[in-house]
């Protein structure tokens, strides 16, 4: 006779990149134009050690794998100078007549110590139920993120979709990410 097996308490189906927010020392800003976030765990491995005597395995120590952080690839559908400023540093140029209008961006000079800011990245995805209704949002927070220098390409007949590479590494005693469920998305304001 089969034993009683418990059913999982939660079966959470999430979809879409609904919102991405960046938390810096100056506050939090968000953008809803990203359409892809790929996360690659960064690991360090120590090889397994096996004791084989005359063709017989006598003992073995298994391979050890240590998670050291995550490499995040964020694909956005528009160029966001404020995001790039956080990722790699540099300077945003504003119009003198309209002080909130961005008229340019200059990256840090080659060899500069300007590397952007350390930040938290929050990625929100929607959770739907069987009726097609959003029931809540999944928020994954990655700590201690830093961007890598950004490059741009263009192609005839295609809008540019910049890819940003971000490295996240937890501090000692800190988790590499945290998942929370929230009833609604933060509201983007001016």
Where are the regions a protein language model picked out?
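Short acidic DE-rich linear segments
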Residues: 2, 104-107, 185-190
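Solvent-exposed edge beta-strands and adjacent loop segments
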Residues: 2-89, 144-158
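A general secondary-structure signal for short beta-strands and their flanking turns/coil
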Residues: 15, 67-71, 116-120, 135, ...
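Short, surface-exposed beta-strand/loop "edge" segments at domain boundaries and coil↔beta transitions
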Residues: 27-30, 81-83, 125-137, 174-177
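Exposed beta-sheet edge/beta-hairpin loop segments within beta-rich domains
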Residues: 64-65, 108-113, 131-134, 150-161
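Extracellular-facing segments of soluble proteins and assemblies that are Gly/Ser/Thr-biased and enriched
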Residues: 65-122
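Extended, acidic-biased charged interface segments
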Residues: 114-143, 171
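Mixed-charge, glycine-accented linear interaction segment located at domain edges/termini
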Residues: 136-190
């Amino acid at each position: 006779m089969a034993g009683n097996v418990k059913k999982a308490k939660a079966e959470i189906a999430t979809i879409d990149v609904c919102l991405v927010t960046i938390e810096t020392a100056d506050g939090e800003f968000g953008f809803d134009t990203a359409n892809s976030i790929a996360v690659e765990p960064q690991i360090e491995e120590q090889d397994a050690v096996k004791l084989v005597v005359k063709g017989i395995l006598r003992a073995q120590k298994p391979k050890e794998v240590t998670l050291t952080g995550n490499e995040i690839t964020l694909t956005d559908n528009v160029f966001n100078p404020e995001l790039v400023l956080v990722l790699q540093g540099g300077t945003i140029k504003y119009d003198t007549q309209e002080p909130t209008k961005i008229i340019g961006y200059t990256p840090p000079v080659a060899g500069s110590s300007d590397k952007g800011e350390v930040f938290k990245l929050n990625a929100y995805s929607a959770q739907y139920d069987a009726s097609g209704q959003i029931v809540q949002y999944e928020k994954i927070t990655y700590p201690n993120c830093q961007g890598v220098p950004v490059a741009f390409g263009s192609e005839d007949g295609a809008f540019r979709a910049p890819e940003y590479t971000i490295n996240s590494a937890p501090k000692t005693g800190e988790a590499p990410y945290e998942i929370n469920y929230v009833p609604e998305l933060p509201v983007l304001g001016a």
